[in-house]
Amino acid sequence: MINGSTKIVGLIGHPVEHSFSPPMHNAAFEELGLDYAYVPFNVCPENLKSAILGAKSLNIKGFNVTIPHKINVMKYLDKLDPIAKLIGAVNTIDFKEMKGYNTDGIGCIKAIGEVTSIKDKNIVVAGAGGASRAISFYLARENPQSIHILNRDINKAKSLAEDVKNSKLTDNVDFDSIDKIVGYVSDADILIDTTPVSYTHLRAH
């Protein structure tokens, strides 16, 4: 039962209705006997700064961060974990230090690793936002044959591909318009979708 001593954590994004995080986290808190509550907050981009500052003032302990805030939220934090700084995106905030972290990449790599190896695979990444940045950097560390980053805004795809190359993790990364995805997928071993299309489908159901 929520009371005055309950610690609040949550998710910020726009939208958040699709998220499975609240039931998953709250079930875990209950099972572990932890006095925490996980709450989703639908925050429009123009309200991001006030939401972050307000959350700290309200003694909220931490946030997970989802689309579309993973990059822009960094400017409102005091510290960044080295990996989050390298990636250029944040998906977790600890308000105790106003510090941002990124766990998207390692989470994706571990999930794929349960099914297949990434080494020597031809990989297509759809999207070039915060999640795509994290995943692309981690993929590059696993020695894939190639990484193709496809995005609606081709300049964002180009920028991400160049950042991955500049990290010296791999040279086998390129970019293109997401309009050409059919041609890339036909030759791909692994397809990773980081675009909002999946969320739109979930909201429709």
Where are these regions (language model features)?
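Conserved S-adenosyl-L-methionine
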Residues: 141-146
